[in-house]
Regions:
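Residues forming the flavin
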Residues: 1-51, 57-532
């Protein structure tokens, strides 16, 4: 195959248009062209008078070597798709256990199951079908189930999000992750669009299908099963204890992949007491900002924003702040909604979610400020959790209880005044909102950096500082404030042989794809350690 990049095509291009361009670039007749595979499709909207697509493709020709030899350097290059990892044959005395059914845990368990070692996947929450009912109960009635919510349950926090599949990592395993999603029902275009996403509605079916494959391959999936302790002999794993149906049970194993996510604070406390090494890490905190989606799309695409080939526009913004922390947007959800993301009673935090169609009236994004371990007020490894919790409790009180969220208009934040009434932008957060002053629940340095960032971002994206744009508090769970150090070669936790910290909760990922990649890597490490 040959790869061609930077192919500019109009918004209404057809396969015939693309083929004509390829034949011209390759200087070959139509009969040479056997197949064309899209590798990447992105929108170039830098010039609002000339919004167009930019493509990368892989082509198969009858005489590739002959065609390539007569082309100028840089027109095309040999290409092969990254191969899925080879799974070593391994033997385990007891089935390996994966703790947590988020992206890292699901992909770890699936990798182990495909290797024929019949893993046990445990999840403290419920299957995605039942979990959806718990989330609806929160949205409609303001009732929290501490074990089944936006954070806990099959699919992890990513199941109730935009289903965004972008990542800053360059791992060859990314293709494996995306292809696995497609094989389990995700749209095929995630393999090539520049900013792939699935949407919460489709992602639930994908997650359910992955679970079914794990079971079909001989693995077990146990829900409502919470890790309560490690069983060790010296510094080696011998098993775990779990709470299931109100009873404590033991599971014998010398291999545990720990993929508990960034919100299992109680589990982290248990592990710390048992001697698992942990350290503080920086993360970020802030709010969700909501604008009319039409405003964002017009700002990004100009007059052609209603073109049928263009989807709801997104954005990714970042500014340097005077204190050096930085303010940036994260997990932007076009046509989405702000959702309740609490997992503990009397604490409030928010997240963003979109369906696949991204057809909602509002756009939302996290607007975050970098926080450092010295902000935690204590050098205890879990001090970041305590600080997070205190801010979530302050937001809960400011919202008046019942998981109603405090909101503030952008104009009011910029002028240091409380919001008393809402403007043209109507909130999407359920079970409800309360106009407020976010200074009552966020530290001063975060407020000041948010103000600075909003003003600067308005210069990058016209309308970002719209007076009626809404800020919903608080976004505290963008990533984990804790890292579990692990050996770079074996990927095992320091001082605990057989324990593999994985994914976002362990501090080694930041999003669905990077967590999934890390889950695969830890599973491969365990397989190699037990290779025959």
């Amino acid at each position: 195959m040959l790869r061609l990049d930077s192919l500019s095509l109009p918004l209404d291009f057809t396969p015939e248009t693309l083929n004509t361009l390829l034949l011209r670039k390759l200087k070959c007749p139509p009969e040479q062209l056997k197949s064309v595979v899209l590798l990447k499709k992105a929108v170039d909207a830098r010039d609002k008078a000339d919004v167009h697509f930019v493509l990368s493709v892989a082509v198969t020709l009858k005489d590739e070597a002959k065609v390539l030899a007569r082309l100028k350097p840089g027109v095309a290059a040999p290409f092969t798709f990254p191969k899925a990892p080879t799974l070593p044959k391994a033997r385990f005395e007891h089935p390996p256990v994966v703790v947590g059914a988020g992206p890292a845990g699901l992909f770890a368990a699936l990798t182990l199951a495909r290797a024929g070692v019949q893993p046990i996947l445990i999840e403290r929450g419920k299957p995605v079908e039942e979990r959806t009912k718990s989330v609806q109960m929160m949205q409609e009635q303001g009732i929290l189930d501490p074990e089944s919510n936006v954070q806990f349950g099959e699919g992890g926090a990513g199941a109730f999000s935009d289903g965004k599949l972008t990542t800053g990592t360059k791992s060859p395993l990314i293709r494996t992750v995306l292809q696995t999603f497609v094989d389990h029902g995700a749209p095929e275009d995630i393999l090539y669009i520049a900013k792939p996403h699935v949407g919460t509605d489709l992602l639930k079916g994908v997650v359910r299908s992955m679970r079914q494959e794990i079971i079909q391959l001989g693995g077990q999936v146990r829900f409502d099963t919470r890790l309560t302790g490690l069983m060790m002999r010296g510094e080696s794993m011998e098993g775990i204890t779990v709470l299931c149906g109100g009873e404590t049970q033991e599971i014998r194993t010398d291999t545990v992949i720990l993929a508990i996510g960034h919100s299992a604070r109680d589990t982290m406390q248990t592990l710390f007491r048992q001697g698992v090494r942990m350290e503080q890490k920086p993360f970020a905190m802030g709010v969700r900002i909501e604008h009319p989606q039409a405003l964002i799309s017009q700002s990004q695409y100009g007059k052609c924003w209603t073109h049928p080939a263009l989807k709801a526009a997104d954005y990714k913004l970042a500014v340097h702040t005077p204190d050096g922390r930085g303010t940036y947007t994260f997990c932007m959800c076009p046509g989405g909604e702000v959702i309740a993301a609490a997992s503990q009673p009397d604490g409030l935090c928010v997240n963003g979610m979109s369906y696949h169609a991204r057809a909602g009236e509002n756009a939302n994004s996290a607007l975050l400020v970098g926080v450092r371990p010295e902000d935690f007020g204590d050098d205890h490894p879990l001090a970041g959790f305590v600080w997070q919790r205190s801010i979530e409790q302050a937001a809960f009180r400011l919202g008046g209880g019942g998981y109603k969220a405090p909101v503030q208009r952008v104009e009011d934040l910029l002028h240091d005044r409380a919001t008393t009434r809402l403007g043209d932008v109507q909130p999407t957060y359920r079970p409800g909102v309360v106009p407020a002053d976010l200074r009552a629940c966020l530290p001063d340095f975060i407020i000041e950096d948010l103000k600075f960032g909003i003003r600067r971002m308005d210069g990058q994206l016209h309308g970002f500082a719209h007076p009626d744009a809404l800020l919903t508090g608080v976004e505290t769970r963008s990533s984990s404030p804790v890292r579990l150090p692990r050996n770079r070669e074996t990927l095992m936790a320091e001082r605990v042989d057989g324990l593999y910290p994985a994914g976002e909760g362990a501090g080694f990922a930041g999003g669905i794809v990077s967590a999934a990649v890390d889950g695969i890597q830890t599973a491969l490490a365990a397989l190699h350690h037990h290779a025959e």
